[in-house]
Amino acid sequence: MIKISDQPVEGKTDRYLLLILVFALSGIYFLLFVNYIFFYQENRMLFIYSWEYSGRFFSKPGGLLEYAGNFLTQGYINNIYGSVIVAIVLTAVAAVFLKINKKLSPGNSFSLMLASVASCVLLLMHTNINYRIHNNLGFLITGIWFLITISNENKISRIIILSFFPVFFFVTGTYAWLYLGMATIYNIFRKNLIFTVLLWIVAAFTILISKMLIFLQPWTGLISYPLPAAGYFSRPSSVWIILLFFVFYPAFIILSGKLKMSYNRNLSVYSFLAVFILTTFILLKNYSRDTSQVFRLEKMFFARDWDGVINYQETYRNRNLVAQYYYNTALAERGMLCDRMFSAPQDYGTMSVMIPWSSQISMNRLFRGVYFYYTIGLVNEAHRWAFESMVTEGFHPENIKLLIKTNLINGHYKIAEKYITVLKKTLHYKRLAGKFESMLSNPELIRSDPELSERAKLKPQDNFVITIRNPETNINSLLQSNPGNIRALEYKLACLMLDKKSDEVVNNLSNLLDTDNQRIPRHIEEAALFYQFASGPLPDLALLRISGETISRFSDYIKLTKNISRDQIRQGSGIREDLKKTYWYYLDTR
Amino acid sequence: MIKKNADPVIMILIFGLFLSGGCKSGNGNLSEIDREPVIEPDYSGVTIPPNIAPMNFSIKEEGKSFLAEVLSSNGQRILIKSGNGIIRFPMRSWKKLLEGNQGGAINIHLISIDNKGARKKYKPVGFFLADDPVDPWISYRLLYPGYESYLEIVIRQRRAESFRECSVIDNHLLKTNCINCHSFCQNDPDKFLVHIRGSVGGTYFSEGSKVVRRDLKTPEMKYGAVYPAWHPGGKFVAFSSNSIVQSFHASQEYNIEVTDLASSLVVYDVERNIMSPVPEEDTVKYMETFPEWSPEGNWLYYCRALETDDSSDFRSIKYDLVRKAFHQETFSFGKAEIVFDALSIDKSVSFPRVSPDGRYLVFTLHNNGNFSIWHKEADLYLLDISAGKAERMSVNSDETESYHSWSSNGKWLLFSSKRTDGLTARPYIAYFGSGDKVGKPFVLPQKNPELYLRMVKTFNKPEFMTGRIPAGPRDFERASKKEAEKAGWRIY
């Protein structure tokens, strides 16, 4: 419990307390709860140390802000660094707005509360996975520029402020309009209309000259970049509400100062503590364990930690489509798709095995579909998805890795070299680029690399046309082209099981003989037994045999489910855990 | 670092010092290498126009520093020292090398020096200078050699005589619509058109700096106007009207297949904004595409294949080169006659382009279909129209050659080639003295010669222009905000 004593003026201790609270709350929340945001954002961009990369950000106002944000985002590779970066920026926002408050309304009892609102709303915004650090940097820089504006109001300072507005616009883009709004509100209260009018004239000239002479950008780009897209938020108006809050911030602080003339420390401290309590409550309420699990799975998936993905999903049984897709892909990578896929939820049928191409879905989400093609050995199609992603989103670690790998597998070394050159110019992926670079000069390393050589074996032996909207068709084409592709066969059988087509599973059993597989995968055995039980005798399986263990389990399953209702089966009551992880249970419950 | 040609005597002295080890400590042995150095781009033995931009290159040999002594047959000499192997010619010195040197040569003597000061002298690399200048400007579409998605597409113009480059159209200003291919009326920068696909779609006609947006698809047309060809008089544009599908290959040798399901030819009257069909008398249904006029405008060349259906194997679609006589006064066409029977050799023709003198026609020959840019085997062929004889051109490589165009004087061919990496097209220029005198092509020089090595974007449909396009991205943006003028339909 914080002890509060009545003091005539706001004290340093309270301000420090506020700053410590902002730092602690944001740091701890990001470190312990939503660190997946770091993983997500770090994996959606690639900061490249090259003039070409930097040059792109110079071509539009606000680009430098995004560039600075991207530079900082590199630190997100580590959760501690990431949390510290976010916490420092938010704390700096609070510090700057405290200074503004002190300038505008010294001894204001609501000063701490308003400054904490400023940083807490940005903290809340930052918990959206698409809200990036440059957005908070924008608010921070705007706050600093506003502070400079109000700190010295002599003629020369005013001229400097006016003449630097175009530069401020170039650096921050949209935030210049936020500054314009703040400065206007402030000057209305100060009754300094000449400066306001001059500022608006400079702003109007700035945007007109920018549009007509300098930047090849549409009006929308000049007005709203680099704000996050409104569509990223469940309430698209959130961004505009926040902007309005900051625009009217000077009014809030000036008017609140007029409410109560003398400083009341209790009011001051309790009000800002209330903001923190409310923020903490919202943060905890908004926290989604499911989302956190999906990104943890994705992190393991990107690290190719297949066993980690499998065990995690089997433990937490996440119902999210992406989680199930990663689980199935990880199983396929480990050659266990038809042995283990029913050990975790399968709620989406074949959708959780493959994601069909759709130009209506944002590449950001669609991109995950690439792994099906890469896993199955349709390297050209995997390359296409990675390339489409690069075209629409720019380079990010996953698409560039896949571009390099697919080109190496296909023997397109000169193209691979281009991407490797890019990867070499990054901070965290230099070493990986070095590994790929060594493959360029020594293709034997490609043949000896377990991941790449395996893909090369799975590739089609002859050409066919990819069916982009119906990925299942491609499995058949691939199997025709390369009958030895066990992974394609497993995918085919998995799809048939998910579609509950046991008869077709049985009809395809003989294809197992075309592969190196000398045993029937567990779930396929289960499908075969079910078929035998429901429809009749199995075809000749030559050397393949159904194991006694599966036969025994089937017998147990029949016995257990014979005397219980369908609802009880669905609820899983009275069913042994091992029997819930079977194709029979999937058939009964889906 | 450049030591320029202020005084030839001093330059020779410096070069002599370099050779004798005067510049470096160490034993200073000079060994003569009995081959040319590897340079990027490969400019060895190319024929260049007397008004081309500096042919900067980088040396792909081991060495801590390099020295290039450049000698021209007009007696000019420059010396360039480089620490990173990149040889950049100063513009003024380069111009002096070219001035009055038509028909002559430029030889570059290269020396590499290693860490210990040992020097290697290579056989000189030579450029041949043609008598004929090249058109001063080039335009191209710059985009990712992608599949379905696009974000950044620009049409840029570049001065062939320097490195000056600027945007003509930028899809950032066109609501990120797709910018399709552009087409000029006889290399005229004041008269060209471009299709835009998307929310501000239409065909944009640029005349001087005035840009108008038109909707050429009339209700009578099943499909939109696609591949254009300006009639030399500038009054008409022939278009193919195509239904195009795109598919992707599973095999590593191929990427994309772009196929027509149906296509026919139409002619657009630019002044009257009226579209008219090119009559088809044949009972057999054909797909007709890639129109091209002869320089006098009395022949319409195009590619023609038997019409297929959805179930047809794309590999079976083969296009012949065909032409029809055109009578402008009566707006009537003659009967189709086959100019090059590609089907008989199990090949397919695309992109016919007639030389300005009307004697030659260059086309792309490939295995099937009409969209050769994704066909590794696509090569340029030169057809002597009067002799009816076509031959594979010496300018080809193992990768795709396509999208060729002639300079206005007919002495230079500009084409895209994917020879550097198999994926990204680069603009190559080749001297065309006559049918049997074609120079080794060179890639359009860049200020940074390593640009092509790291650039992932592709140079699409490079075209020569006799000057700079006066219209700019903002003109197109303004035009996009106006309603498209709808074309009418008339059957002659």
Residue ranges and their predicted role:
Chain A
Residues 6-23, 105-111:
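N-terminal membrane topogenic signal
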Residues 15-39, 205-211, 277-283:
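Transmembrane signal-anchor helices characteristic of membrane glycosylation enzymes that use polyprenol
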Residues 43, 58-62, 82, 86, ...:
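Membrane-interface micro-motifs in multi-pass membrane enzymes
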Residues 263-288:
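Internal/C-terminal transmembrane anchor helices
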Residues 283-457, 463, 472, 480-501:
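Soluble catalytic regions of membrane-associated enzymes that act on cell-envelope
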